[in-house]
Design a protein with these regions (language model features):
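Alpha-helical transmembrane segments of multi-pass membrane transport proteins
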Residues: 1-430
């Protein structure tokens, strides 16, 4: 067996297929099969590995969380969360930018998807901000960068995927770990928005009214309760992440159809069809990534990667920066789920060897991937934001540059201050 040739076929073939614009799941599958053929591995193992890859009780939560997000996102919740955020922070300088950021924090806890956040909130907030005197490119930049908060704020199906890939981490602990980093990201984006708004004389909203805030909170409480059901239920040990997700789907259906009345039954079937499309992609990717991960382990790629990185420096700070750099580069050329599935088995052992907790590393991975969603050439959220605003992508990227800095600062704080991620899980889970 020529190990070097097998590694070249696996990694080189995968990168080649990605650059040739093959769907990621196909690129993973083809490169894995080619590697197994070169290595002389029995291909009968292929099906067994794929079935095993998706035969996880924890992963059953993924379709439920995706369905919950789709139902809530289409059920009239966006406007109510925007009104709630407006009553809370609309009075500040650059009020609508602050509303955008805070609404994304709320909405992220329901959808768990940056793309859904950008499409749903962006279609409402970008025109609203432009009408109030904000530049269109600034409005779009705020929308797409704040959408990344939703990746950190639970419940997030990407957190479930990471928890499973990393070796059955506690999903509840990972959920709790996302709240403070998500708030930190929101705060950093608000600081950036305030500075730009002050410089450009963007308007303030109405003066803060406690009565108005309480009224809007009462209107939005049905949606926010879905988050409470999931997180409190999982953390409190009442039910598992999968069970909580299933309950949340039923709750979301009731709220969207009967309380907010944003969906009729025809709309429900349409939403479920969209969920099936999304879910099929995710599950195929998880199944093929299980084969890819087997090939990586068989060829000792994680060990080689660890030796290669530690040979560059034995300084934990430098290694942590290198890990972030690798994840940022991957984020520029790949979508989020494949990065989690492929990079975690390789990079997590390196991270733990320098004292980074697996839960903290999960938050780092997710935020790095989020930044990648805003970065060309793949940048799916960047493309969605540009399409919603009807602006050239280059103009949106230019307006986003100051917010990249805010996100990098947040990433570095999360990397080098473990308690930002670990304090809440340690407090409530032990």
């Amino acid at each position: 067996m020529n190990t070097s040739l097998a590694i070249a076929v696996l990694l080189g073939g995968f990168l080649l297929l990605v650059f040739l614009r093959f769907p990621i799941a196909y690129a993973v599958a083809i490169s894995s099969i080619a590697c197994m053929l070169v290595n002389g591995t029995n291909l009968a193992l292929l099906c067994k590995l794929m079935v095993k890859g998706i035969s996880s009780f924890s992963l059953m939560a993924v379709p439920f969380f995706i369905t919950m997000g789709c139902l809530m996102g289409s059920g009239g919740i966006s406007e109510k969360l925007i009104d709630l955020a407006n009553s809370l922070v609309g009075w500040m300088t650059g009020g609508m930018a602050m509303v955008n950021i805070v609404a994304s924090y709320f909405f992220g806890g329901i959808s768990g998807s940056a793309a859904a956040d950008t499409a749903s909130l962006g279609s409402i907030l970008i025109p609203m901000m432009v009408d109030q005197g904000y530049d269109a490119d600034f409005s779009t930049a705020v929308t797409i960068t704040s959408s990344c908060e939703g990746l950190l704020v639970p419940p997030s199906h990407n957190m479930v995927i990471y928890a499973t890939t990393a070796g059955s981490l506690s999903v509840g602990a990972l959920f709790l770990a996302g709240y403070i980093p998500g708030a930190l990201l929101a705060a950093s984006l608000m600081v950036g928005s305030y500075i730009i708004s002050k410089k450009r004389n963007y308007p303030k909203g109405e003066k803060f009214s406690l009565g108005k805030f309480i009224k809007q909170l009462g209107t939005s409480i049905w949606a926010l309760a879905a988050i409470i059901i999931v997180v409190v239920g999982v953390v409190g040990g009442v039910f598992t992440a999968t069970e909580s997700a299933a309950i949340a789907v039923i709750y979301s259906l009731i709220v969207s159809v009967f309380i907010y009345k944003g969906l009729n039954w025809k709309g429900v079937w349409r939403v479920l069809g969209d969920c099936v499309d999304t879910l099929s992609i995710v599950l195929i990717l998880i199944a093929t990534s299980a084969v890819f991960g087997y090939c990586l382990t068989m060829l000792h790629v994680p060990d080689m990667a660890a030796k290669a990185i530690t040979s560059l420096s034995d300084n934990p700070i430098v290694i942590a920066l290198l890990l972030n750099l690798i994840l940022l580069i991957l984020g520029c050329i790949m979508d989020m789920a494949p990065i989690i599935l492929i990079a975690t088995p390789i990079l997590l052992p390196i991270a733990t060897s320098i004292g980074i907790h697996p839960i903290q590393f999960g938050i780092m991975v997710i935020l790095n991937c989020g930044i990648g969603l805003l970065t060309p050439p793949v940048g799916s959220v960047l493309f969605i934001g540009s399409a919603v605003a009807k602006l050239p992508m280059e103009k949106v990227v230019k307006a986003t540059l100051p917010f990249y800095l805010c996100m990098i600062v947040s990433l570095l704080l999360i990397t080098f201050i473990p308690q930002i991620s670990l304090w809440l899980p340690n407090l409530l889970m032990h």
